[in-house]
Amino acid sequence: MTSPTKHALLSASSAHRWLSAPPLPRLEQYFPQSTSTAAEEGTAAHALAEYKVHRALGDLKFPRPSSDYQCDEMELLTDDYSSYIMEQYVKAKKFAKDPLIKVELKLDFSQYVPEGFGTGDCVIVSDHLLHIIDFKYGKGVKVVARNNPQMKLYALGALAMFGNLYNIDEVETTIFQPRMSNISTWTIPVKELMHWANTELKEKAELAFMGKGS
């Protein structure tokens, strides 16, 4: 996921933290943001992965990024990610004549989370199904898709964008984490997702934005 130029206070990537401890984001504003080699490596991998998906989709003018972090392993694993995306796109074509695919799509979920936005690595929309795919280059912690709040927030943003254009009744979320040989997929009905958004999510997001709660 390419980092937006503006950082959301209640980011999707930190949702697991502020949903559990709503006052945390406001407290963290008092501490300077820092980066790490792992984070910089992840940014480089995401940029390379984005380039390869664009190329696979026929966008030959999309510029190839350069980074000192690029290596044989990164080349191989971003190839795997690109291949997986194309497999899912081909799969979507079996259920819809002309499915929509978007790469590094800015998603606005501020209807539920104050000033909430994020960037979806890949979004595929077909009849009745929305598929959100997130590329994780980290190898320290295995990430699962089941009830993953980051993925659910991305899904809400995509539904806000495409829900009136497609008859979507199910959301599929996938974590693609190649350095841990992890492809984790989870499916949730749109009705269930919206119930969570309008109850637990909204309540805790409002508390977190105000720096309240416990």
Where in the sequence are the language-model features?
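Mg2+/Mn2+-dependent nuclease catalytic core
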Residues: 97-212
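Cysteine-cluster motifs in flexible loop/terminal segments that predominantly coordinate metals
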Residues: 21, 25, 207-214
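Metal-dependent nuclease catalytic cores that hydrolyze phosphodiester bonds in DNA/RNA
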Residues: 1-130
